[in-house]
């Protein structure tokens, strides 16, 4: 908003300065020049020349002594602009050429490709459940009878305080016994260490007897309180109003069994590819098929150790199977 107001004020100032410079506010009005005649040659008629009227010159009246009021805007505009003296000027007729250019618009072709949109509409069977309304019965508010208890105030009981006489304790001074200092002998250590025992003189302290003062038994004044009887108020039994509720019957709506559309799927056949088993081209090392009456096996040096291990495993399994008896704590031979 501030920018627009500032630009408007600047524009008004510029227009006022331009009017003062040209003298349009106080001088002659602008002269109007007549438009030139246009001659057009017809195609069939003879050529005719048309003459235009000479331009008429209009003279301005002598300048009057009317002065413009001084401008209220900054003094820079008024100081630099001078009013020109009005002189009669004759303007020549100016002919303007108008050239019309042929504008060719290019035809713009827009390609509109509409895609076929397929919408799937699935209609689902909606079953509305019947709304069951429950009847609510409002209970009448039950007021309870309030009974006020009688408050009994107790009489304040004053206690008698007895001050005890201060008892002075007899102080007995203990006899201090000084111990004789024992001199220790320093022995130089040799390869064999000699150990000497020093006996310390022990002084027995005399038992100190403390003076015992017997205190006189202090008797406290006992005041018997009168038994306070409390007023007992029997409350009347409050009977509550019992309202029997009518059994509410719920509307049972039987739903129609909904049948689901079962679509049978066509059995899909899987392409079965038979794997080609590569048969060994080299003859295996070993014996011919086992059985009685066959040829004896000469053995295979490459597989002897493996065959022996397998035979040992089979023998151990057979032995464990024979030892196993259900329910026995140990293996049986």
UniProtKB/Swiss-Prot annotation:
<feature type="region of interest" description="Disordered">
    <location>
        <begin position="51"/>
        <end position="285"/>
    </location>
</feature>
<feature type="signal peptide">
    <location>
        <begin position="1"/>
        <end position="23"/>
    </location>
</feature>
<feature type="compositionally biased region" description="Pro residues">
    <location>
        <begin position="60"/>
        <end position="73"/>
    </location>
</feature>
<dbReference type="GO" id="GO:0007594">
    <property type="term" value="P:puparial adhesion"/>
</dbReference>
<protein>
    <recommendedName>
        <fullName>Salivary glue protein Sgs-3</fullName>
    </recommendedName>
</protein>
<feature type="compositionally biased region" description="Low complexity">
    <location>
        <begin position="74"/>
        <end position="88"/>
    </location>
</feature>
<feature type="compositionally biased region" description="Basic residues">
    <location>
        <begin position="89"/>
        <end position="277"/>
    </location>
</feature>
<keyword id="KW-0732">Signal</keyword>
<dbReference type="GO" id="GO:0005576">
    <property type="term" value="C:extracellular region"/>
</dbReference>
<keyword id="KW-0677">Repeat</keyword>
């Amino acid at each position: 908003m501030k920018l627009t107001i500032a630009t408007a004020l600047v524009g008004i100032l510029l227009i006022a300065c331009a009017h003062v410079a040209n003298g349009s506010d106080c001088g002659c009005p602008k002269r109007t020049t007549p438009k030139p005649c246009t001659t057009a040659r017809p195609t069939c008629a003879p050529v005719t020349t048309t003459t235009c009227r000479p331009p008429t010159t209009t003279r301005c009246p002598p300048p009057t002594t009317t002065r413009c009021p001084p401008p209220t805007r900054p003094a820079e505009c008024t100081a630099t602009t001078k009013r020109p003296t009005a002189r009669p000027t004759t303007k020549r007729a100016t002919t303007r050429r108008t050239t019309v250019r042929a504008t060719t618009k290019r035809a713009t072709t827009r390609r509109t490709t509409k895609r076929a949109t397929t919408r799937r509409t699935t209609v689902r069977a909606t079953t509305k459940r019947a709304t069951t309304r429950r009847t609510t019965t409002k209970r009448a508010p039950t007021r309870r009878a309030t009974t006020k208890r009688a408050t009994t105030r107790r009489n304040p009981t004053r206690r008698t305080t007895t001050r005890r006489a201060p008892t002075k304790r007899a102080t007995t001074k203990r006899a201090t016994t000084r111990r004789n200092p024992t001199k220790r002998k320093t022995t130089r250590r040799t390869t064999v260490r000699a150990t000497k025992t020093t006996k310390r003189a022990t002084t027995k302290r005399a038992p100190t007897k403390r003076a015992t003062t017997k205190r006189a038994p202090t008797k406290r004044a006992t005041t018997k309180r009168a038994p306070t009887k409390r007023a007992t108020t029997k409350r009347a039994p409050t009977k509550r109003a019992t309202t029997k509720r009518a059994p509410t019957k719920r509307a049972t709506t039987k739903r129609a069994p909904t049948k689901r559309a079962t679509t049978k799927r066509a059995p899909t056949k899987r392409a079965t590819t038979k794997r080609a088993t590569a048969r060994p081209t080299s003859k295996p090392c070993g014996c011919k098929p086992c059985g009685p009456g066959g040829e004896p096996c000469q053995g295979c040096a490459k597989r002897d150790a493996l065959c022996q291990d397998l035979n040992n495993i089979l023998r151990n399994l057979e032995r464990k199977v024979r030892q196993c008896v259900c329910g026995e704590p140990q293996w049986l031979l």
